[in-house]
Amino acid sequence: MRVLGCDFSSRPTARKPITMALGHLLAGDTVVLQELLEFASLDAWAAWLARPADAAQSAQSAWVGGFDLPFGLPRELVEQLAWPTDWAACMDHYAGLTRQAIREQFKAFCAARPAGGKFAHRATDGPAGASPSMKWVNPPVAYMLHAGLPLLRAAGVHLPGLQRPGEGDARRVALEAYPGMLARAVIGRLSYKSDEPVRQTPERHQARVQLLAALESGDNPLALRLRIDAEETRNQLLADGSGDRLDAVICMLQAAWAAARRAQGDALYGLPHDLDPLEGWIVTAQA
């Protein structure tokens, strides 16, 4: 099974591109990293996603992907703002807003709430240790949702747990992933990345070495072994001080975990069967 992971940027550039890791889930517990791709624009990324799976070569062109961006908003927020509570209608409404309108409405929502509880959370945020999907800064995941999810939907992929049965191309499956969840489980709160060159320290490099070693050995909560055949590729993962390439690889492993669950008969790819279909769920997070 072909698997992929995506470290997303809502405003990609040549310096800070969208990064994707492509690989293959072998029988057993091994995931082979085959290729790293970079996209300097949303249009280029969308064009890649929209490539249809070839029915005659489904094993080669079909994929299950883990994408590091939110796929939904907190139900509490949606209901408070009187937005549609059907996921598709809610996402249509959200896509039609400007970033400024999103920021203003979310800031007003937070301003009316007590200190310590400014943001609304999805049910998956706690188990995953993820930021609220309504945050517009540090990190701006609300804008990632706004920029990325409409392109996934336009590409016609299947979104388990969110779409109705039969919607989307079941040979191209997209799941919400979060690399920080696996990284913390392996190296705790050690920082392994920074977008600021001055903060890309030897200590963070050593944390990447430790994290990658756990992925390659299988000594991680997913019990999957990452195989990297090209030493050059391994060096690229370790040398990337931003951590984007390593994050894409972690998302790929989370997608592989989900693909294995599907192969065992789980139509929701390991997602909880009682998940909130408005909010969605981060793959591999335990309910």
Spell out what each predicted region is.
Residues 1-4, 8-287:
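RNase H-like (RuvC/DEDD) metal-dependent nuclease/polynucleotide-processing core
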